[in-house]
């Protein structure tokens, strides 16, 4: 049979997806984290893989789903949080713009799965299934109550789940995980479609969302999930030493306040007394597209006058950041290769060919 007749849509998908194959899985497994450091990789949206000097591996908010894929239904889902926020009826054109850089079914070495909250782009049934099927049978699933309810509903045993709320501390090998207050007001209006938010006092944030501080032997990482800007960041900065802080950044559409702006990201870094602040989430949704260079430009304008003690870092999905080795870098670039050029004799018609 000819190739053009044997190839199907299914064979095409299996041969190209996930786009990075197991490349990043292998890179993470092979990484030897030096003493006094920690390494992390951006998995897209707010997904992070963190690896300590002791070889402890945890993932946070690793999501393997998609956004809109069809114009079929022109209307937003009734009762959606964005509909509640802005009184809209039209479908939100949020298409996923980031490739899948990590294969969940190629994960073998992992010590904990975490989620900050239960929004679809922060917790994933495929990740849960892959870990349950292919990894050690004692890997815990850690998150606020709403996340644990989801995991249990998907079939993760209750005894594998750990509910956390602000103030709780969970030890995973050489990483100490502190659950802290979250400031995700959008989470408070994520309700059943038939439940009204107008005129009703929201229930507590603590069951719905948490921020995390990861204390490793080589430094600390603050993961803010989908939190908006809050004055309370300063309290977290007073109470904890924070080396690297991650904040959800995006260009909010008209009538919407769901992501931090460039000014908010700088205020967050200052309030937390962080050394490095890194925006994320701006990569994933087409309708929240934002240029992180805006953060750096604003930082340059303000840093001397306001005596900032932190630097911004502009990352790329799938890229690695190592603390403290990368603390003075401003931007990430994927490895360019060709570092071994001219280690063998070139095969050219003549030397001046190039």
Curated annotation (Swiss-Prot):
Its main location: cytoplasm. The keyword Hydrolase applies. Pathway: Cofactor degradation; L-ascorbate degradation; D-xylulose 5-phosphate from L-ascorbate: step 1/4. Its EC number is 3.1.1.-. It comes from the Bacteria. Its cofactor is a divalent metal cation. Induction: Induced by L-ascorbate. Repressed by UlaR. GO terms for molecular function: L-ascorbate 6-phosphate lactonase activity; manganese ion binding. It catalyses: L-ascorbate 6-phosphate + H2O = 3-dehydro-L-gulonate 6-phosphate. Keywords: Cytoplasm, Hydrolase. InterPro entries: L-ascorbate_6P_UlaG (IPR023951), Metallo-B-lactamas (IPR001279), RibonucZ/Hydroxyglut_hydro (IPR036866), UlaG-like_MBL-fold (IPR048021), UPF0173_UPF0282_UlaG_hydrolase (IPR050114). One of its GO terms (cellular component) is cytoplasm. It is found in: Cytoplasm. Gene3D superfamilies: Ribonuclease Z/Hydroxyacylglutathione hydrolase-like (3.60.15.10). One of its GO terms (biological process) is L-ascorbic acid catabolic process. It is an enzyme of class 3 (hydrolase). Probably catalyzes the hydrolysis of L-ascorbate-6-P into 3-keto-L-gulonate-6-P. Is essential for L-ascorbate utilization under anaerobic conditions. NCBIfam families: PRK11709.1. HAMAP family: UlaG. Belongs to the UlaG family. This is Probable L-ascorbate-6-phosphate lactonase UlaG. It comes from Escherichia coli (strain SMS-3-5 / SECEC). The lineage of its organism: Bacteria, Pseudomonadati, Pseudomonadota, Gammaproteobacteria, Enterobacterales.
